């Protein structure tokens, strides 16, 4: 952990004599600390517990003040394991919130919640730090210009386009491909836009965090030879961390992204995987602090905690932070308070469907459930809007006809409906796409499809020009020309078999 030089002089060493306290109670990750009268730390101040455990090993545990209890006591939440701590150990008030390194030196590195590098590449070469607790930008600083953020993923760009400087939610249950989609977005945006990304791994699997790091090194997003040329900083607070760390790691990642926006004046991508774990950690901490639970056992401060994080993610006149947040949906229930609270802050939602994943259509983005406030003619243009609406209408009609097809069969439909079903099935398959990050598993090279190409492809399917092509030709291809080439290849293979 860094100490913010602007607020705390030369760091912990000068504070030792000024404001030491003592641990008086430890309950799991929650510590009660007594301080001398008149020297109470502020809420959110970082405390450091120093001492030695039973075998003489040094202990250095950082905590964050959450409650002032009276009788010169505070209640703090630990950011790391509390094994080995005992009552009576010395606690130092740093006089400032947790502060983390920011700037170009963070790129290509992995940090924990305290801003300490955990990638075995040595200390971070920067003296610039920033506190993780800040207020959102003032209204007068905000930028209100509307523009699309092209991702190169067909289903996203056509049906639920992302806003530059907006907030996007990736909704889906376990195992439907949220993290793979996030990895593809980091890859595409780094390569196509030259953008800087910050990835906050909040309460997810350590294995996934490691896989993501290795994948980024392979794809060149993290440059091992010249680490300064990397395009992403990683901040991890994984499942095995105490709830305090998981609750604050999102703020650490956001603080790093804010520096790129406000000081370097860049457009930044902030990925949070998973925002539900941020809520879950807050719920654990709330219970440990003795607060009365609210609906479904969540913390009573759920909306406030979510708002304090989300309102800092915005576009200013200096730069923008576009945030893509994976949202685990408990039991696939979108009315659960955690995903429902998240919805209120989002400009677009990308909903992943278990049904599509079961069919083998990846990315398994549900074209009818996914939404975007950007899909308006005055923003995306008439051509894009009309194409998207016709695609949705075709898929909606196909969905309505599926019960009839299941009971009576395809032959009982009218000629017009049979044609519509054939086109809908082609559209459904054409919405799939091979990913760069999945090349290792599938053997198919990844494809980046520009928005103009995407619109052209779907217009050709809707117009009926490609009615003669088999539907499997549209599965896992990039643009429409590849689908046509695949159809010719399939026809040749079929003729050879005959």
From Swiss-Prot:
Gene Ontology cellular-component annotations: chloroplast thylakoid membrane; mitochondrion; proton-transporting ATP synthase complex
EC number(s) recorded for this UniProt protein: 7.1.2.2
InterPro entries, A to Z: AAA+_ATPase, ATP-synt_VA_C, ATP_synth_F1_bsu, ATPase_a/bsu_AS, ATPase_alpha/beta_chains, ATPase_F1/V1/A1_a/bsu_N, ATPase_F1/V1/A1_a/bsu_N_sf, ATPase_F1/V1/A1_a/bsu_nucl-bd
Broad class of where this protein is predominantly found: plastid
One of the protein's GO biological processes: proton motive force-driven mitochondrial ATP synthesis
Localization per Swiss-Prot or TrEMBL: Plastid, Chloroplast thylakoid membrane
UniProt-annotated binding residues for ATP: 172-179
Keywords on record: ATP synthesis, ATP-binding, CF(1), Chloroplast, Hydrogen ion transport, Ion transport, Membrane, Nucleotide-binding, Plastid, Thylakoid, Translocase, Transport
Domain of life, source organism: Eukaryota
GO terms, molecular function: ATP binding; ATP hydrolysis activity; proton-transporting ATP synthase activity, rotational mechanism
Gene3D superfamilies (alphabetical): 2.40.10.170, Bovine Mitochondrial F1-atpase, Atp Synthase Beta Chain, Chain D, domain 3, P-loop containing nucleotide triphosphate hydrolases
Annotated catalysed reactions: ATP + H2O + 4 H(+)(in) = ADP + phosphate + 5 H(+)(out)
Lipid bilayer topology: Peripheral membrane protein
Family recorded in the similarity comment: Belongs to the ATPase alpha/beta chains family.
Family matches, as HAMAP family: ATP_synth_beta_bact (MF_01347)
Role according to the record: Produces ATP from ADP in the presence of a proton gradient across the membrane. The catalytic sites are hosted primarily by the beta subunits.
Description of how the protein assembles with itself and partners: F-type ATPases have 2 components, CF(1) - the catalytic core - and CF(0) - the membrane proton channel. CF(1) has five subunits: alpha(3), beta(3), gamma(1), delta(1), epsilon(1). CF(0) has four main subunits: a(1), b(1), b'(1) and c(9-12).
Protein name per Swiss-Prot or TrEMBL: ATP synthase subunit beta, chloroplastic
Organism: Nicotiana rustica (Aztec tobacco)
Gene: atpB
